[in-house]
C-alpha cells in the first residue's frame, strides 16, 4: 500500500526524496540510453535487480548483466536510439515514466518509434525492479 511522503522528506526505502528519485531515473535514461553509457548500469542496477518487463527476451541473464545486455543489443540494432521522457510520477519507492523511443535500424536504415510505460522500484539509491509495457514499434516517415 502506497504511503504519502511529506514534501522534501527522505524515504527510508530509497534513501532519497521524491524529487531525487525522479532525477535519478531521468539521469539513468539519459546516461544509459541516450549517451550509450552501459557502464552506468553497473552502478544504477542493484545486484538483485529483477526485470519484469513484457519486452525482455527469453533467456536474458538475470540481474544487472541482463539489463545491460538487453539495452546493449538494442543499441547495436538501433545505434541512434533515444528515449524522451514525456511524464513522470513518483510515489513511495516507485517512479512511473511515460516515454517515447526512436531509433534507426542499422541493417535497413528505417526509422522506428514506440512508446511505453516503465515502472521502477528503487531501494538504497539503486534500481531493484522494473516493469515495462511497450507499444509495437512503428515505421516513421
What spans do the regions from the language model cover?
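A beta-strand edge to alpha-helix "cap/lid" segment located at domain peripheries
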Residues: 2-20, 30-33, 37, 52, ...
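Conserved class I S-adenosyl-L-methionine
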Residues: 46-48
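Domain-length accessory/inserted modules outside core catalytic folds
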Residues: 61-64
Amino acid at each position: 500500500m502506497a504511503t504519502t511522503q511529506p514534501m522534501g522528506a527522505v524515504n527510508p526505502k530509497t534513501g532519497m526524496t521524491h524529487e531525487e528519485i525522479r532525477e535519478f531515473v531521468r539521469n539513468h535514461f539519459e546516461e544509459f540510453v541516450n549517451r550509450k553509457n552501459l557502464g552506468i548500469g553497473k552502478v544504477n542496477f542493484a545486484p538483485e535487480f529483477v526485470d519484469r518487463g513484457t519486452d525482455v527476451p527469453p533467456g536474458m541473464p538475470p540481474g544487472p548483466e541482463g539489463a545491460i545486455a538487453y539495452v546493449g543489443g538494442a543499441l547495436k540494432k538501433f545505434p541512434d536510439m533515444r528515449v524522451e521522457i514525456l511524464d513522470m510520477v513518483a510515489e513511495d519507492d516507485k517512479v512511473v515514466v511515460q516515454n517515447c523511443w526512436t531509433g534507426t535500424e542499422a541493417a535497413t536504415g528505417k526509422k522506428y518509434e514506440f512508446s511505453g510505460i516503465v515502472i521502477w522500484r528503487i531501494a538504497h539509491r539503486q534500481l531493484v525492479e522494473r516493469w515495462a509495457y511497450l507499444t509495437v514499434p512503428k515505421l516513421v516517415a
